[in-house]
């Protein structure tokens, strides 16, 4: 890394002190975001029918977390058949990427009423804010949940064009407005 920076003549500008700090838990985790897959019009149909797809649920900026009696919390990554029927009605999907032959898709279920929310979910799970549990999650879990939350937050706060005021449309598997 240093050799490349020296050859570019950036020695005085490059923040070498950043290499000495703690790693960003929400940063790189090995997830391949597969931008080529986002352009495909049938991405959703393909991934919904793939047994290697895992879904992470996002409800009002909170993530579904498994909290076992013993051990550390972890992200709940569900197969399609494990998602309760009352949560499948949403059309808010975002393709997150692929890692170790598994595809990851985020689902925003914020429109689901709080009383209907926990029906059919794993017993030891609940929706938690990442600020409460993010630091003790596995790095991959923290990364994928924060990435999912960030995309849905971005979508929710950009429903209308900042220039003309018209309603925006989400495309490219949730990554473009």
Segments from the language model and where they lie:
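N-terminal amphipathic/basic-hydrophobic helices that include classical n-h-c signal peptides
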Residues: 1-9
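N-terminal alpha-helical interaction blocks
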Residues: 8-137
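Aromatic-residue detector
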Residues: 56, 105, 142-145, 162-163, ...
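Generic signal for short, ordered secondary-structure residues
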Residues: 127, 139-143, 158
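Solvent-exposed, flexible loop/coil residues
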Residues: 131-134, 141, 156, 172
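Short, charged surface segments at domain edges that flank catalytic/cofactor-binding sites
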Residues: 135-153
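Cys/His-rich short segments
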Residues: 147-177
